[in-house]
Amino acid sequence: MAKVESFTLDHTAVKAPYVRLITTEHGAKGDVISNYDLRLVQPNTAAIDTAGLHTIEHLLASLLRDRMDGVIDCSPFGCRTGFHLITWGEHSTTEVAKALKSSLEAIANDITWDDVPGVDIKSCGNYKDHSLFSAKEWAKLILSRGISNDPYTRQVV
């Protein structure tokens, strides 16, 4: 089986919340794609409930695109501790952390249910599994801990 970087990461050594560049891939025609670890909660100590995580996912899909160029996708980890962010080009972890922080601030303070995209039967594959209340509570908790641009040394942006 192929070696997967995220399964070689020492999850006991990282200090969430943080942004980590996992890899930058260069295509045959010169295109560049970057993959980031947006770790919101400490691995093996907490996990975001699925309804809250699902709502955060829908909101980050839009909010990160408003704050950064080149966002391709933002998808949750199966362990429910954060997200993969895939982008065109290369962004510093500081730039990504600032965009994430601003997005979580919007979720915590400004977003209403009417702002959450894709929450009906036609636009979501599990539309009943959402919680804006949970998303807001998690956003507040994550922000209170600060988002680092380094996974091992706390460098809060």
Swiss-Prot record:
The keyword Protease belongs to this UniProt entry's keyword annotation: no
Signal peptide range in chain numbering: none
BP-aspect Gene Ontology terms: quorum sensing
The organism's place on the tree of life at top rank: Bacteria
Cofactor binding, per record: Binds 1 Fe cation per subunit.
Catalytic activity annotation: S-(5-deoxy-D-ribos-5-yl)-L-homocysteine = (S)-4,5-dihydroxypentane-2,3-dione + L-homocysteine
Binding residue positions for Fe cation: 54, 58, 124
Disulfide bond positions: none
Gene Ontology molecular function, alphabetical: iron ion binding; S-ribosylhomocysteine lyase activity
EC number: 4.4.1.21
NCBIfam families: PRK02260.2-4, PRK02260.3-1, PRK02260.3-3
Sequence similarity: Belongs to the LuxS family.
Name recorded for this polypeptide: S-ribosylhomocysteine lyase
Organism (species): Lacticaseibacillus paracasei (strain ATCC 334 / BCRC 17002 / CCUG 31169 / CIP 107868 / KCTC 3260 / NRRL B-441) (Lactobacillus paracasei)
Lineage: Bacteria, Bacillati, Bacillota, Bacilli, Lactobacillales
Gene: luxS
